């Protein structure tokens, strides 16, 4: 069985990753590092509360057992961070720091929750996309045994919506056909399950490539259509 660590465990996708890991027999222990403790409980959960995000990365090397897989679902909004510069410190700088620390600690599989459309025609001119591109490129350069980048569309099913109107619209697109919704947004549960499923494939030596970008269609396939408990 595998040991895992999760960063961003209290967010929409991160909480689903955590719940999925705790319910899976494939993972023997799960550690989390966050500003506030997750609500989930389990005998195999080691939850670390650390308000100073600059210390997050260094905790990886001290975890016991040492995680083979690290999931990073850290993310915020410009409004919540108090401006684009502060958002950059979290969504870009902190995420790269965690990835570097994971590599130094000997983590084999690194899973990062990015965003769909980050490699589009105009994406390099959009601050949010530039953050995600920077993190993706840094992870690739670190040379993990397996690096997995999930690029979901709009996240739906959240308790606290970041874009209530748009999320509500996307959330009802399945009435026009599930495929219509799948091409635009995915439920947080499906994204979380897809992240864990991809990590399990990598750990079993079944990932399609060393650097695997999991796009929306694969997220739906792994997290819903082919999902097995």
Swiss-Prot record:
Q: How is it placed in the membrane, per its record?
A: Peripheral membrane protein
Q: Which GO terms describe its biological process?
A: import into nucleus
User: According to its UniProt record, what is one Pfam family this protein matches?
Assistant: NAD_binding_10
Localization recorded for this chain is: Mitochondrion outer membrane
List the record's Gene Ontology CC terms alphabetically.
Answer: mitochondrial outer membrane
Tell me where on the tree of life, at the top rank, the source sits: Eukaryota
Q: Does the keyword Isomerase apply?
A: no
- Write the record's keywords in alphabetical order, separated by commas: Membrane, Mitochondrion, Mitochondrion outer membrane, Transit peptide
Under InterPro entries, the record lists: NAD(P)-bd_dom, NAD(P)-bd_dom_sf
Q: Its family?
A: Belongs to the FMP52 family.
Annotated protein name in UniProt: Protein fmp52-2, mitochondrial
Organism, per UniProt? Aspergillus terreus (strain NIH 2624 / FGSC A1156)
What is the phylogenetic placement of the source species in the record?
Eukaryota, Fungi, Dikarya, Ascomycota, Pezizomycotina
Q: Which gene encodes it?
A: fmp522
